[in-house]
Amino acid sequence: MEESETVLKLRLQLKEAEEERIKAAQYGLELLESQSDLQNQLEEQRNEMTSTIENLEQEKYSLQREVELKNRMLESLTSECENIRQQQKLCLEQLQEQLERNHHRELSEIKDKLEKLKAELDEARLSEKQLKHKLEYQSEVLANKSEELRMMSERVHETMSSEMLTLQLEKTELESAKANLEQEVNELQYREQQLLLTNGTQSRQLERLQDEKEDREKEAVGYFKALEKAREANQDLQAQLDIALQQAQDPNSKGNSLFAEVEDRRAEMERQLISMKVQFQSLQKQHAFSRQQMHRMKVQIATLLQLKGSQSDPEQLERLQAMVAQKNSEFETLVMKVRQLEKSQQICENGPVANSSDGLGQGDETYYVDLLKMKLVNSSKEIEKIKDELSLQRMKALAESQRVLDLERKLFANDRHLKLSQGENMKLRVNLDEMKMKYEPDEIAKIRTQKRRKEQLPLDCAIDNTSATVTSGSQAHGLSDAIPEDMCPAESTVHRNLLKEDSSLSTKEQDLSSVAVKPIEPANGQPPKERKRVRIVENENDNQDINKRNTNNCSVTSTSPRSASEESTSESKRFDEEQEKRKQERKSRLRAPPVLHVPSKPAATTQCPQQ
């Protein structure tokens, strides 16, 4: 029984185990199926993830490329924007400069027109004033003539003798001579006023031309700076173009390895080195070309300055020749007038003697004769007074003209000396540059700082001033000795006062020149070099000697200040001797004034600009 129970239990257990095994198999199958499903799902998810990652990577790469492109485009756009800004800035600066130039040009034109209008207005006012004065004078002369005509018409009815008629005729002739002399005095005054006006206008025009010259020089400097900037910009662009071409042609510029990066850096450094070499060579060529151009320009400027300093002004020569011809014609007319007056005076002196022999028997007309003689004496006194006044005015005009001529001579000599010194200075600079290029080529290439140079006065100015004062003093003494003996005391005193003023002015100028300009001794203790000078002496022989000296000594040599002072003293003595000779000749021929003969081609040293 127990065995059957155990068999039953075992069978039950076996059934249960089979049932469990069947269930486990079923569960295992279900798990396998679920696992395979999960694996399939996982594969699908993995594939999806890889595809998405690849897409993201592609998108990332494309985005990076796009970002790089955008950055490049942005850089190009910024560079283009900067270039456009610079171009607009340059255009704006050019427009501003052009507007400023146009403005300056218009201002200069307006100033020129204003100066011309002012000069025309001054001339019109002066001419109007002179015409008014002439009209008043002519009206007075007309009134006097009408009064004389009325008196003559009243006296025609009266019975008069031939002597009275001759005396009246002489009186009318003397009055007409007086009127002519007054008219000449007025014309000389008008001419002096016109000369003063033209001198003022010319001085204003000279100042305006100097201002225009400075403006033109500033414009030239601005143009040169702009040209240098354009050249520098062109060189930079050329270097950038060379670098870009080298980068485009370099095959080793691509790669991601370390060696490729090193190669890229080396190529970049080589490109930079090549660009620097190209820039250096271009700068060297430009520097050599600019040095050659500057050297040629300096040589040309020196030759032009020498030519300009040596040659004389043809307009000035023609003007001086015309003035000399005019003065000669005036002297000839004055000599003819003096001869006519002497003839008329002789006739008048012979006439009363013949009439006095006829009038011995006419005792009744002695009263009228005495009266007419008294009138004649009074008229002769008035004529002498008018002559004295005329001589005073002439002496004043001569003194003023002499001062003007002296000042113009000094100005011309200073201008010529300045031009010669500028030419010599330019020559010395050219020689200095040549020596530096020959012996110090490396130091010239260095950047030199701009230094200010002091312009010293030439040493010849002091001696020129002293010689001018000596000549002015000798001329004053000569003029004081040349006062004629038959001059009235009032005229002689006025003449002496004028000469004293001239001498005092000359001594003041000498003192100022001696104080202002002193000879500067060099550092080595040698005496300063000075130039030879030629003084202006109013004599034909001296002019011929000066011409010979100028033709023989074309090159300017240097002499000591002691020899120059000795020359000035010897020339002053010679001038005094010539003045004494002239005084003796003037005394020997009182009534025959000499005619001044001036050569048609005056020397270049005796010329001065006549306004």
Curated annotation (Swiss-Prot):
Any one of the GO BP annotations:
protein localization to kinetochore
User: According to the UniProt entry, which residue ranges have a biased composition of type Polar residues?
Assistant: 549-567
Q: Which domain of life is it from?
A: Eukaryota
Q: Lyase: present as a keyword of the record?
A: no
The record's InterPro entries line, in alphabetical order, gives: SPDLY_chordates, Spindly/BICDR_Dynein_Adapter
Q: Name one GO molecular function term.
A: kinetochore binding
Q: Where in the cell is it found?
A: Chromosome, Centromere, Kinetochore
Primary location group:
nucleus
Region ranges (Disordered): 499-611
Presence of the UniProt keyword Coiled coil in the record? yes
Q: Which GO terms describe its cellular component?
A: nucleus; outer kinetochore; spindle pole
Q: From the UniProt record, list the coiled-coil ranges.
A: 1-288
Q: Which UniProt keywords apply?
A: Cell cycle, Cell division, Centromere, Chromosome, Coiled coil, Kinetochore, Mitosis
Q: Where is there biased composition of kind Basic and acidic residues?
A: 499-511, 570-583
Q: Which family does it belong to?
A: Belongs to the Spindly family.
Query: What exactly does this protein do?
Result: Required for the localization of dynein and dynactin to the mitotic kintochore. Dynein is believed to control the initial lateral interaction between the kinetochore and spindle microtubules and to facilitate the subsequent formation of end-on kinetochore-microtubule attachments mediated by the NDC80 complex. May act as an adapter protein linking the dynein motor complex to various cargos.
Return the HAMAP family for the record: SPDLY
For this entry, the protein name equals Protein Spindly
> Per the UniProt entry, what species is this protein from, by scientific name?
Xenopus tropicalis (Western clawed frog)
Gene name?
A: spdl1
